[in-house]
Amino acid sequence: MEHYLRSVHNSPTLSMISAARGLSPAEVAHEHLKERGIYGLAPPPPPGTTPTEYCHQMAFLASHASPYGELLVQSAAAGNTSHLHDYLTPMDVSRFSSPRVTPRLSRKRALSISPLSDASIDLQTMIRTSPNSLVAYINNSRSSSAASGSYGHLSAGAISPAFSFPIHKPCSLSAALSQQRSLSSSFGHTPLLHPSPTFASRQQGALTSANPAPPSNNSSAPDSVLNKVSSESAVSSTVNQVIHKRSKVKTEEEADSVRFPQPPDHLTDLKEDLDKDECKQEPEHIYETNCHWDGCSKEFDTQDQLVHHINNDHIHGEKKEFVCRWQDCSREQKPFKAQYMLVVHMRRHTGEKPHKCTFEGCFKAYSRLENLKTHLRSHTGEKPYVCDHEGCNKAFSNASDRAKHQNRTHSNEKPYICKVPGCTKRYTDPSSLRKHVKTVHGPEAHVTKKHRNDIIQKPSLPKENGDNEASAKLSGREHSDSVSRDQEHCLQTRTIKTEDNMMHQSSPGGQSSCSSEPSPYGNTNNIDSGVDVSLAWQGSLGDLFGLEETSPVVDSTVSSWQRSGRPATPETQRIHSAETGTAEEREIKDNERFLLIYEPNATCQNTRLPTISANGFDVIGVPSSVLINPRAIELSMNDVTMMNQLNERRDSTSSTLSSAYTSRRSSGISPYFSSRRSSETSQFGGRLNNSSSADSYDPISTDASRRSSEASQHSGLPNLLNLTPAQHYRLKAKYAAATGGPPPTPLPNMDRIGLRNKLSLMDGADFPLPPFRQLPVPRRCSDGGGNAGLTPMYPHEIPGNNSRRASDPVRRTAGIDDKPLPRFSRFHSMNSMNTLHPPSLSERRNGGLQHYTCSDGGLHRHVYSPRPPSISENVAMEAISCDADVPGGDDDLMLPDDVVQYIRSQNREAPEQNLQTEYSSPARNLQSNTKSFHNNTPEQPRAPGAYLSRNFPALAECLGQTANMQDNNMPVQWNEVSSGTVDVSDLPKQQFAAGNLAVVQQKQNFAQYQSFNQAPMQRAHNIMGQGQESVQRNISVNGQRFNYLQQRQQQMSQCQIVSSDFIPQQRYSQSQSMLSSRAMQEGQSQISPSCNNMVERPGVHTHAAPSNTLNHQRLAVHGAPTQGFANNFSVNQDGLHPPNAYTVQPQKNGLEPQQNTLGMSGQAFNHGMIQPRPPAAPHPPNRPRNIHPVHHPPYMRSPHPVSELSPGQQTAEATPKRTSENTDPTPKDNNLLYYSGQIHMYEPNGNFGSGIDCTVRQLPTMPSPGANQVTSTVDSQGLEHPPVIDFDAMMDDGDHSSLMSGTLSPGLLQSFSQTSSRLTTPRNSLTLPSIPAGINNMAIGDMSSMLTTLAEESKFLNLMS
């Protein structure tokens, strides 16, 4: 005792408690006792304890410098000495269970006040204030919580060994403790223990163990007892069978004693709860070593042997019949539904408690895992069950306590009516009712399911933990014929929770406080698991989860279902019978609810907590995650309204489900955390995966995350996702009002749907969107779910606002803000503009796998209605579109009509292009691949090195290295490959062609080129000569393409697909070549001044006469194609800036573009890299964007700035405006990309003769897929075609290394980044490592990367289309 007092005195918990209450420990204890009414109680000394002894004990306690000493003295004076002694005298109470005494009545009512209760110490405060104190407090109450079986409840029923004290006259103490236990139960199991829960709980535990609580130790009691025990069984399993047996005995005794003093129902309930809890405590461990199985009398030396014997010989031996044949088993051989239930049940007989508390110094063990879990809450202080009553912050470790609390504290409702004829008792929680029935009416009078149904059945034998669990699972047990058993099962279902109830008691705030108080969800159908709350309850998901975790899954499941039916608290379970009675009173109305409780499928009707209606949806089958978001469930339940609600919530609603899941990414990086969208998307968090580019791309990808969320919104759930975008849109429109959002703008996606139909018309076939999305294809497009319209733009979404999420394409304020651009449905994603057309199968297989950047492609260059479709709409449509396998529709869906037409023509031409690209050289192959890549051949990896690796291992190797390096170096978007962009590293085939599409590739290409340039580039230069012929041919073709391309650009400014035939040199310059061939062919002058950044390598000046001739443009170099761009890549098509046109701004590249734009000639780029500069802003549609094709023959060389280009123009725009000037229809060239990004070509040697700010401008109208679409900043319609650099020509011209030399300038990347809110425009976010100055002039290479990016974008567009 002294030891105990010391521990108590020194108990941080006590200190904390006193501190919490502003009382000295003594005052705390005193006040606590006083509050508990202990002082008002003057029970005789414990039986067998002489007053002298009792006083001696108290004196002993008082003699110690313990707050309890004073309390004891005071209490002794008050005549409560015996009880105080009981409280203060730590005894192995767990070994003593005693009937509750009258004091318990007053205490019981007081007990309703949990430590968390007002009168009691605020355990939450304690816990939150001082975990240590809480832990200490819990440790003190640990045994009680554990012993009491009310996990986390202070009065666990037994004092932990650490707190056990030598018992003066244990017998008398046992009696005293019995009384004490009653008192403690009354007091919340530890009146003093609130100050020092440990003591009380332990005493209680000791009392419990000493005097098995008749009801509390019911697990050993008859089934009726066991029902309580069953609920208690969880704990009861903890409780020794012997104790249970004792409990049985004591239960009856206690029933009498309790019965005798029974105060108001609440007190009685509390008393019963305490008893129950105590019983739950799993009193003294039964240690059976002899087998009493029917016909078996084997004896064993150890319990383990017995258990082994029973399990192997009896249980497993009767595999198909799960019947306990133990002699005198209260179950009366009622079969269990599952073997494990029988196994658990047998623990009642054997006393096995395999689940031991792992906390140091805590020796609690439980037969049921859920009881252990509940118990552990006493250590952790976890109280997942928070009172649902507004303004009440009390939390409970179990649902039953919460239910008690809620019903008792916040209402006078006693829904649990005793169904025993002639009994009018009503209780606030099922455990109390159960306890009442057991104690007052006897173990046979258990409230059964039928009782609850107002059918009083012969109380089935109490379920044990296993039984309870089984019951819980069985809740309406297999043997409905044995109604009592069924009832019992029902109770036991709750009984399972009853153990949980025990557990709930064990919560620090719980047992006495919590247990006394119904768990917060108790109002709801409290199941200890708290699952009760799941459907019916408005409680948090955490409750469900916590409850489930707390209680066995079965319990949680059952209880959750039960909860739906009614609160399943420990009491609920135990009281299931009682609950049947009391709850029936209210639940008679709610018998269905009980059915729900027992029948998971039944929806709870009368849960106190707002039930989450499942639209007939049985939550049971729903994943907890789904359950978490009832809305999602409802959605899955086809509640379109839920969709609307989710949409309304968009961010928060959806996020409930998906935020944690689907929006995990979205919340990750994006400045605005796609969490919003992901929330939206999350709404349907059921989505199997976030198709969002975020998922597809870099997990970090900001933009992807949000969109991915959006995509994910629809991804998992078939309901919305099943809807076609149009359907989704309709739903959206229907619920626009509900969502509070403006009526969904006819989705561009809808338009796209229409478009798709149109495209289908174009294609001649309209492919219905699959009811479910195909596997969500990682896509920016998915991110581009067209819900942006509903969703307010985020700052980052605001055009020109760079703060926008990378995933959110933002119109660049520069040009776009200046002029109203056709509003893309969503700047956040390509799809926002237009629902992404599902990529073609090949695209999905390839591009989709490669996370084709749909985001830009998704942007249809339509003027969209002011309100773009909501994210959900777009997402759903997008997801559907993107995922749907629409033979012709995929591309169509992704692209605007013009784009689709363009793509179609391109696709038709693609073979031609491919053939063209396939002239003879690997470069052609690369081009072909690039083309095919752009031709919606996602299949062709974009990884810059992959294709090269195929053709040029060295290049590929360099590229691969660079890609990896640069992907790492790249901004997330780049890694993510800029929402629309595919990560280059992932794309092996489209090396450079994709480079521009994915700036990442560019970076990779550059870095690769940097290393690659030096050798492979030179080699490429060598090849270049070879390739040049091809290039020339290709250029010819490219010229044709370019012409066609121009047409397409005009037609499909949105689709910037640059394909070019690449010789290996061109490979690294593939994109560049493509761009150069086409862009330059298309309009060398189209190269925006940003292109001026491309430095012509002093050496051969390739001046392509700014003739529209494809060859000239194609060469974009003034020399023969054979003139390689090698060292003299003059790309000064009209787009070239003056030497200092722009300072290359290092993006995330290692390269630092020179602050001054590289001089046209002479200015050597220090980094020897081409770093595309992002255009300062997208040019206004009217802004002169590009040098007219081949207006300025001098490309790189010509130092003259292209005055016609505005600086912004000079700056490559991630999304170049389409220049109507360059409208020369070129043979469809998927490879043809328009790189609007400004590329700063830095000569590896830094020798670029002229710093050319080459803004390879994709046709402004046709930003590379990532560019405009991602950027969403540019209205392609109104934009001029940016000068296109003919990288093929450049490549042909020679210095590939110069082309390749260096990553796109950070500025270019930056412009990309600016332009491309998403990775779609890899250029924006792509940080290209600078290419060593020593590397060959890679201006083209950089252009190539740019072109590659553009190509990728084009490909992406193609994919989207």
Curated annotation (Swiss-Prot):
It comes from Xenopus laevis (African clawed frog). Residues 185-270, 434-527, 556-584, 647-720, 787-832, 906-946, 1134-1230 are annotated as: Disordered. PROSITE patterns: ZINC_FINGER_C2H2_1, ZINC_FINGER_C2H2_2. The lineage of its organism: Eukaryota, Metazoa, Chordata, Craniata, Vertebrata. One of its GO terms (biological process) is smoothened signaling pathway. The keyword Zinc-finger applies. GO terms for molecular function: DNA-binding transcription factor activity, RNA polymerase II-specific; RNA polymerase II cis-regulatory region sequence-specific DNA binding; zinc ion binding. It comes from the Eukaryota. It is found in: Nucleus. Residues 475-502, 573-584, 805-821 have a biased composition (Basic and acidic residues). One of its GO terms (cellular component) is nucleus. InterPro entries: GLI-like, Znf-C2H2_ZIC1-5/GLI1-3-like, Znf_C2H2_sf, Znf_C2H2_type. A zinc finger (C2H2-type) spans 289-314, 322-349, 355-379, 385-410, 416-441. Belongs to the GLI C2H2-type zinc-finger protein family. Has an essential role in the early embryonic patterning of mesoderm and neuroectoderm. This is Zinc finger protein GLI4. Residues 1172-1183 have a biased composition (Pro residues). Keywords: DNA-binding, Metal-binding, Nucleus, Repeat, Transcription, Transcription regulation, Zinc, Zinc-finger. Residues 506-522, 653-670 have a biased composition (Low complexity). Residues 198-208, 227-241, 672-695, 710-720, 913-939, 1142-1164 have a biased composition (Polar residues).
